[in-house]
A protein has these predicted regions:
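Short beta-turn/strand-loop junction motif enriched in small, turn-promoting residues
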Residues: 20-23, 152, 199
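Contiguous C-terminal substrate-recognition/catalytic subdomains in enzyme active sites
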Residues: 132-185, 193
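Residues immediately flanking
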Residues: 40, 149, 196-197, 222
Length: 272
């Protein structure tokens, strides 16, 4: 909201991205800092200057890098382009062509469905590792595979849990004040899943049909199996990873961030 207010009511004149290692007493990547000047009025098409000091490894070098900065450290950008991005991030280091993808393409939200996540309200009672239950009960859908995130991994895997899926268990998920059950039209569908907490990197995986998921294994669903594979390939690409890292630079990858990724125009019948 602060960024949106700045972009809509002021004009950024210049911004120095001090970045990591800004404080000698910390001297780490815990805190990032920037300094900027702004005019208290909107000046359309004003070309602001942005200076990136992240190349300095130690805080003591920041002054030297700024005073001796080269052209490679300075970028000029019209701030109007930031307002078109989800969350209005000031990603001055990306090319204008890259940023214009949000203007000229559809996004994942145009092709996907998201309608909440399951929540048991009592994981000790309703969740098991798949080897802890009789395999016949999984075949009979008394227990079904349950995507709940896990360590970084691309393409496939990390589904080692099962959730109790008996009629009485589902009634509990519906009625309990803490628990939640996703709508029936999403039961057992294949899709794309990922770990909500992304401490290492971002990795998307195929969610097989016959299972379900919770917020730890956030998931999206699509109209066809071919589209699932196409979107999985696109989301695991380097451009998509770059976009997601500036849409949400934290370790918690939200569904809304993934659905905001622009989708290039391509033939879905030939993709993947």
């Amino acid at each position: 909201s602060l960024r949106r207010k700045l972009l809509s009511t002021t004009t950024i004149g210049s911004l120095v991205h001090i970045g990591y290692n800004s404080f000698p007493e910390i001297n780490s990547k815990i805190v990032q800092v920037c300094a900027f000047s702004a005019h208290a009025a909107r000046v359309p098409e004003f070309l602001a200057r942005y200076v990136n000091l992240n190349s300095a490894e130690q805080s003591a070098n920041k002054d030297d890098v700024f005073l001796g900065r080269t052209a490679e450290l300075t970028t000029s950008v019209h701030q109007e382009i930031f307002s078109k991005l989800p969350g209005s991030p000031l990603v001055y280091w990306l090319s204008e062509h890259f940023l214009q993808m949000f203007d000229t393409n559809s996004t994942v939200s145009d092709f996907s469905v998201s309608d909440g996540q399951n929540k048991t309200g009592d994981n000790e009672r309703y969740l098991r590792c798949h080897w802890e239950v009789d395999v016949r009960s999984i075949a009979e859908k008394s227990w079904i595979p349950y995507a709940k995130g896990g360590p970084w991994r691309k393409w496939y895997g990390n589904v080692y849990l099962v959730i109790c899926w008996t009629s009485s268990a589902r009634q509990h998920y519906k009625k309990d004040k803490i628990a939640r059950l996703i709508p029936e039209y999403l039961w057992y569908r294949d899709g794309v899943t990922w770990s909500f907490i992304t401490t290492k990197d971002i990795g998307f995986r195929y969610l097989e049909p016959g299972g379900t998921f919770d917020v730890g294994g956030s998931s999206l669903f699509f109209e066809s199996e071919d589209l699932v594979y196409s979107m999985l390939a696109m989301l695991n690409s380097k451009p998509a990873t770059t976009i997601l890292k500036f849409l949400n630079p934290t370790i918690s990858l939200q569904v809304e961030n993934v659905r905001s990724v622009p989708v290039p125009v391509f033939d879905m019948n030939r993709a993947a």
